[in-house]
């Protein structure tokens, strides 16, 4: 997976306005969960990933399943080449009314506008790959549109490019997007709303770090391995 090629392609992608509702804050949804003593769960849909996962489940079936559970939001992969996603998936997902993260490699503020037009409520800014100037533009444009930003990192050195904001969530991705290997948990940085991403499944969910405000989980939910039900039954979410 060539990250530079993905960014270059995303700079040429666009989406005309087709959202059907106002934005719904993902950050606020997680805060509300935390206020009730729970963690916010972001349920992710993807058709495939470079790590080797793939599914034949269509997005409508997935949405019907997860909306019956306590989720704070949805993460929808919209990158077409490596994840077989599209802005069409975002538009479909935003109709159920929960916050939608457009999970993609946002290269600039123009991509934010397309994510908004498609129906997104939040975008992803990957600190490991973006210059701080672009992160700041993404945060500002998102705020203008009423959207949130998950500023994600894998390498702690990337945190020097972190841009604070009232619409910002800090996410730690345990997966290295270059090597695609999943690393061990790190010491959680101090921030008011934080999420843990990648590698949470039924085999390790009992040990999940409860210091995080929320979790982003995709593969294990798509596999129906019981992780979602475990989190719900034990009132973690």
Swiss-Prot record:
Keywords: Amino-acid biosynthesis, Aromatic amino acid biosynthesis, Decarboxylase, Lyase, Tryptophan biosynthesis. The keyword Cell membrane does not apply. It is an enzyme of class 4 (lyase). GO terms for molecular function: indole-3-glycerol-phosphate synthase activity; phosphoribosylanthranilate isomerase activity. One of its GO terms (biological process) is L-tryptophan biosynthetic process. Pathway: Amino-acid biosynthesis; L-tryptophan biosynthesis; L-tryptophan from chorismate: step 4/5. Pfam families: IGPS. CDD domains: IGPS. Its EC number is 4.1.1.48. The keyword Plastid does not apply. It comes from the Archaea. It catalyses: 1-(2-carboxyphenylamino)-1-deoxy-D-ribulose 5-phosphate + H(+) = (1S,2R)-1-C-(indol-3-yl)glycerol 3-phosphate + CO2 + H2O. Belongs to the TrpC family. PANTHER family: INDOLE-3-GLYCEROL-PHOSPHATE SYNTHASE, TRYPTOPHAN BIOSYNTHESIS PROTEIN. This is Indole-3-glycerol phosphate synthase.
